[in-house]
Design a protein with these regions (language model features):
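Short, Lys/Arg-rich, polar N-terminal cytosolic tail immediately upstream
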Residues: 1-14
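Hydrophobic alpha-helical transmembrane segments of integral membrane proteins
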Residues: 14-15, 19-23, 67, 74, 98-127, ...
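N-terminal signal-anchor transmembrane alpha helix
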Residues: 15-38
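Interfacial helix-loop-helix junctions of multi-pass membrane proteins
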Residues: 38-48, 117-137
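Perimembrane loop-to-helix junctions flanking transmembrane segments
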Residues: 45-62
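Membrane-interface loop-to-helix entry segments
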Residues: 59-83, 134-152, 157
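Cytoplasmic juxtamembrane regions at transmembrane-helix boundaries
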Residues: 83-108, 163-167
Length: 167
């Protein structure tokens, strides 16, 4: 004999889980973009390229391993985000609309850029977006891009048709 449960309305815990799921997923996607596009495709920098200049095979190996750990961390953020999104829906329709989810993703990605830009580029200076001429412009541009995503993400999450962060 099978029983069916009555669908229940989403509670505030579902909304918080969904919000944090989108933010963590955005953190992971931001990290993947940085690692895949800037580290691998464009080869502008590695995670530790200002500490271990990738001019020798040994230093390139160290940077590649560090990049691998960086990718593993972004993968964990992505998995946490997916798990929280799943938990927030509990097999039902999502408690928010698509714009709110896009807002949470942008907010998470912007949070990644802000943390990466302030900590790794400015505070620790373990690498820069694109070392060399105009290095400061690339670093500032990265921060501005992150701030724009934070603002747009926040606005999208706060829109009436997108749900409310206050839930």
């Amino acid at each position: 004999m099978t029983t069916t449960q009555e669908p229940r309305p989403h509670d505030s815990a579902d909304l918080r889980s969904w919000l944090w799921g989108g933010v963590f997923l955005g953190l992971g996607l931001g990290g993947f973009f940085d690692g895949i596009v800037l580290h691998q495709i464009l080869q502008w920098h590695h995670l530790l390229s200002e500490v271990y200049l990738p001019t020798t095979l040994e230093n390139l190996r160290i940077n590649t391993v560090a990049d691998g750990f960086f990718h593993a961390a972004t993968w964990v953020f992505t998995l946490i985000g997916l798990a929280l999104l799943w938990r927030g829906t509990r097999g039902q329709h999502a408690p928010w609309g698509t714009p709110a989810l896009i807002g949470a993703l942008l907010f998470g990605w912007g949070l990644f850029n802000a943390a990466e830009g302030l900590v790794n580029h400015q505070l620790l200076q373990i690498h820069h977006v694109r070392p060399g001429p105009n290095q400061v412009l690339y670093d500032v541009g990265f921060l501005v891009w992150g701030a724009a995503m934070l603002i747009v993400g926040w606005v999208l999450m706060r829109r009436p048709w997108g749900g409310s962060v206050r839930a």
